[in-house]
C-alpha cells in the first residue's frame, strides 16, 4: 500500500512516516500544498493523510482538487483544528475520515 503524508510539521511527519514504514507501507511525504499537488498529479496513492493547514494553501482546497480530478485515493484529514465544522465539511467534500491532532500512532494504523 502506498501512502502520501501531507503535513507541514516536520516532527509529526517523521513520526507518522516511521510508524507506517515499520508496518511495511510505502510512504512518500509532502510538506506544502504545491509539493503535494505535484506528487498527486504524478503518482497514484492508496491513501492520503491530509493536513488542513499548509504553508502555501488549504488542505480542504486540495481535497476539492482531488475530487475534481476524480482521484480515488482514500483520504484521511489530520488537523489540529478539532472543529466540528471542519470535520463535517471535510467529510461532506469526500474525505473518508478525520483524525484530530494530537493522536496516538496506533489510531493511525
Regions flagged by a language model, labelled:
Residues 1-109:
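N-terminal/domain-start alpha-helical segments
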Amino acid at each position: 500500500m502506498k501512502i502520501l503524508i501531507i503535513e507541514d510539521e516536520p516532527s509529526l511527519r517523521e513520526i507518522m512516516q516511521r510508524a507506517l514504514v515499520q508496518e511495511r507501507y510505502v510512504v512518500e511525504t509532502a510538506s506544502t500544498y504545491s509539493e503535494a499537488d505535484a506528487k498527486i498529479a504524478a503518482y497514484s496513492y492508496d491513501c492520503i493523510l491530509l493536513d488542513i493547514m499548509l504553508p502555501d494553501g488549504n488542505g480542504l482546497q486540495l481535497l476539492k482538487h482531488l475530487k475534481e480530478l476524480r482521484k480515488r485515493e482514500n483520504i484521511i484529514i489530520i488537523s489540529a483544528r478539532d472543529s466540528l465544522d471542519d470535520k463535517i465539511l471535510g467529510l461532506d467534500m469526500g474525505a473518508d475520515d478525520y483524525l484530530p491532532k494530537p493522536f496516538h500512532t496506533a489510531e493511525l494504523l
